[in-house]
């Protein structure tokens, strides 16, 4: 039999298949990419066992657990675990601390299905701690540079052309602005942190010692950038991306109207997609009411509403340029100009997309690999 695992680094570097014995409510709060939740107990069973443990102690709780997970229920779960083990002979199982739940499942697989299947020692908690430390160590040991620029300059497009990027918006499934929500939900906070840490781990394993980040706020939609990383972002050097006003308007039209409306259709269907897209856009505009002020918000909202109606009627998106131009001129550009002035001392290079991309590639070559 393969031994139980304590090499968390290799588990994540190799995307080793794992099954999680925790209850669905625990799994939903945070898990690891690609892991399958095949719980020993469902949420209701776990709650009953937990209450029993508090009132009557461990022995009574274990006895109740065996009573709840028995007969056809036990058989169905055993078949699911066995199927996973056979499909992934190189995998592992784990529970919260790598203790009783995973040991019980190991024993049932061995005794009743004839399958020897190893567990991850320390379980979810130990792997989670390892990933938190991975991010912390990168902040302490690696070099970082930020890419900033006015809204619509194509910062994400440039980042995706680099091999040393940490895509905070990608991991958060959010574009980072007031209009940044996607058609699909954002990950749980812990999932966001875990995905980011695994990205760091894999890139460092390839010898990357310098990372490029987009200049973000602490909050990306509903996801919060890890504190140690965000604190570093307040003093990392900054590269400023520039582009013409016309190009920026067209890029925003592409990303936030054409592509996003298509995304809503793909996810929610031809009938519900356009309606949900329109509701999302109007809500995004409503979210910045206080920052826009009443008159300006009313005027831009009406322009957005007319553009959405025309898009739904004919498919044309031309009217969207009106509110985009207004929002840039009257809100985003003044705000970013103020932010740039405050960060001027940290800006080490400014240029268009090609110049910034080549500068960042050359910069990475000058840094020691770690």
Curated annotation (Swiss-Prot):
Keyword field contains Plastid: no
GO BP term, pick one: tRNA wobble uridine modification
Catalyses which reaction(s): 5-methylaminomethyl-2-thiouridine(34) in tRNA + selenophosphate + (2E)-geranyl diphosphate + H2O + H(+) = 5-methylaminomethyl-2-selenouridine(34) in tRNA + (2E)-thiogeraniol + phosphate + diphosphate; 5-methylaminomethyl-2-thiouridine(34) in tRNA + (2E)-geranyl diphosphate = 5-methylaminomethyl-S-(2E)-geranyl-thiouridine(34) in tRNA + diphosphate; 5-methylaminomethyl-S-(2E)-geranyl-thiouridine(34) in tRNA + selenophosphate + H(+) = 5-methylaminomethyl-2-(Se-phospho)selenouridine(34) in tRNA + (2E)-thiogeraniol; 5-methylaminomethyl-2-(Se-phospho)selenouridine(34) in tRNA + H2O = 5-methylaminomethyl-2-selenouridine(34) in tRNA + phosphate
Chain ranges of the Rhodanese domain: 12-136
Enzyme class: transferase
EC number: 2.9.1.3
Keyword terms, alphabetized: Selenium, Transferase
Database matches in Gene3D superfamilies: Rhodanese-like domain
Residues forming the catalytic site: 95
Family matches, as InterPro entries: Rhodanese-like_dom, Rhodanese-like_dom_sf, SelU
UniProt-listed SMART domains: RHOD
Molecular functions (GO terms): transferase activity, transferring alkyl or aryl (other than methyl) groups; tRNA 2-selenouridine synthase activity
Function: Involved in the post-transcriptional modification of the uridine at the wobble position (U34) of tRNA(Lys), tRNA(Glu) and tRNA(Gln). Catalyzes the conversion of 2-thiouridine (S2U-RNA) to 2-selenouridine (Se2U-RNA). Acts in a two-step process involving geranylation of 2-thiouridine (S2U) to S-geranyl-2-thiouridine (geS2U) and subsequent selenation of the latter derivative to 2-selenouridine (Se2U) in the tRNA chain.
UniProt family annotation: Belongs to the SelU family.
Known partners and oligomeric status: Monomer.
UniProt xrefs under HAMAP family: tRNA_sel_U_synth
Name of the protein this chain belongs to: tRNA 2-selenouridine synthase
